[in-house]
Amino acid sequence: TGAPGFFGQGLGLIGLPGASGRIDPAALAEALSAPDVSYRQPAAALSLTNATEYGTVYSAHALAALIAPVKAKGYGVHLDGARLANAAAAGFDLKAVKTLGVDLLVVGGTKAGMPPTEAVVIFDRALARRFDARLKQAGQLPSKGRFYAAPFIGMLEDGGFVRHAAHANAMASRLADLTPFPVRHPVEANGVFVEMDEAALGRLHAAGWFAYRFLDGSVRFMCSWATTAEAVDTGIEWLGARDPAWTWHDLLVRAPRPAIGLPPMALDGTGASAQALSAVPVATQRN
């Protein structure tokens, strides 16, 4: 999308391969062993995502195996936690983050049922210098920002942060178990990726469902804290319907849930946050 380069003043991304969104340690080792020469952007940090964009979850052990060689090279580590709650609900130990060598953690609140907010946790205090200025430069200073941040307190104190994510994960597992289409990736968090033909996808769109083909060609479904079992069952009933003339309205008559807009199982609308080895712009390498 160009966002990293725009906000990073020329920062580039070096994509790293891996199965189902998890970086292959061998691919990372190969990237780290690349020579530092003038015609290559030098690496600066490793960016990881947990849960990943394909709905899989890194264990603390798997993250440690990726982070250790990066720290040995003197690079930084960024952990994108847009779906960190979903990873925690799937068994990832949140307390392990502070011992893994992560320098900067972004904790997503939106997907756990909060307003559109993220909490930035800076473990390397050197990176915190004038962070307020960076926020202002990025336009991240909304009026009354404390009201956006306040839900984090309640959600963390009463366990809602992980509880909501556990529900989303359970709905994804339900969808994966019932879908008539082959599931492309392991369902470990709240995402389900299926192999679907264009005709079926077209019928979904015509019926009002919001789903699209992801980077690998699979069709992406995301379940949220608000997704109901009835919505999942209704969607599955429609997917299994032989009559393509059936619509979402037709199935509402058959499903035990009220007609309130689009199905809660609809795509969450956020863009992908790719896992990559970040690279500093050559012109500002010494900054």
Regions found by a protein language model. Give the residues of each.
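Long, low-complexity, intrinsically disordered segments
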Residues: 265-287
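Conserved PLP-enzyme active-site core in the AAT-like
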Residues: 1-207, 211-227, 235-243, 247-266, ...
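N-terminal non-cleavable signal-anchor helices
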Residues: 233, 254, 281-283
